[in-house]
Design a protein with these regions (language model features):
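Structured helix-beta-strand junction loops
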Residues: 78-79, 158-160, 183
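Active-site metal-binding loops of divalent metal-dependent hydrolases
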Residues: 50-51, 88, 142, 194
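A glycine-centered loop/beta-turn motif at secondary-structure junctions
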Residues: 177-201, 210
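Pocket-forming structural segment of enzyme catalytic cores
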Residues: 97-176
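Beta-strand-turn-beta hairpins that frame and shape the catalytic cleft
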Residues: 1, 132-134, 182-187
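N-terminal beta1-alpha1 cap of cysteine-dependent amidohydrolase-like domains
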Residues: 1-85, 94-99, 104-110, 118, ...
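Active-site-proximal beta-strand elements of phosphoester/diester hydrolases
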Residues: 3-4, 136-140, 188-192
């Protein structure tokens, strides 16, 4: 089992993401540069938080054209696991690997706080049965306001694609959405940071269970190991 953590100019959570998997879950993890055209032997690709390309034009709008994203699209199309965190979620939406878009917070302010999140029953490994009904993870973003058209929202609900909802909405996100997955259940995106919620000195350690639940989508033995 191997994890590939992407690095773009402006990424600033790549080290946190790698540390979450390498130290938190003891899974081999390595960096993949934005100019690379392959992902090696990755079993999970993590698109980390930060400000890729300085957030110029629009969050994630330039990163989607990076050479490595062609490899990520091919990887996801073949059923490979992909996790986008914060700016990574924005990039996955821009790349059409996840539906919808993330726009400026309704307050027009950058929000940085720990949020209580309701866990939705989305997949066998990602739901209240494995994570509990609520978890706590921090956010840090100016553009986390999730938007999608009414038909798209209906599909998200019908297919149980919503992973997490804010208990107290910090950014105006439609339907309190904090995280979603694609229809086939192998691409995950969320604005809260599991990579900032797993060390003993963090306000919460729930991020470790979130990362484990994503991995367990393809590798259920990860959950057994945790038990």
């Amino acid at each position: 089992m191997n994890v590939a953590v992407l690095q773009f100019p402006g990424s600033n959570c790549d080290q946190d993401a790698l540390h979450l998997f390498a130290s938190g879950l003891k899974v081999p993890a390595r960096y993949v540069w934005h100019k690379d055209t392959g992902l090696g032997s990755a079993d999970l690709v993590v698109v980390p938080g930060g400000f890729s390309y300085g957030d110029y034009l629009r969050c994630g709008a330039i990163a989607r054209f990076s050479p490595v994203m062609r490899a990520v699209r091919d990887f996801a199309s073949a059923g490979g696991l992909v996790l986008g965190i914060c700016n990574g979620f924005q990039i996955l939406c821009e790349a059409c690997l996840l539906p919808g878009a993330l726009i400026r917070n309704s307050s027009l302010e950058y929000r940085c706080l720990t949020c209580e999140l309701a866990v939705e029953p989305s997949t066998p490994s990602f739901g209240p049965a494995t994570l509990g009904p609520t978890i706590r993870m921090p956010i840090g973003h100016g553009e986390g306001n999730y938007r999608i058209d009414p038909e798209g929202l209906a599909r998200l609900r019908a297919n149980r694609q919503v992973l997490l909802r804010y208990a107290s909405n910090p950014n105006g996100s439609l339907d309190d959405i904090a995280g979603i997955r694609n229809e086939t259940g192998n691409v995950f995106g969320m604005m809260p940071h599991p990579d900032r919620a797993f060390e003993r000195f963090h306000p919460s350690q729930d991020g470790l269970a979130v990362a484990r639940a994503v991995l367990a989508t393809r590798f259920p033995e990860v959950l057994k190991r945790a038990g």
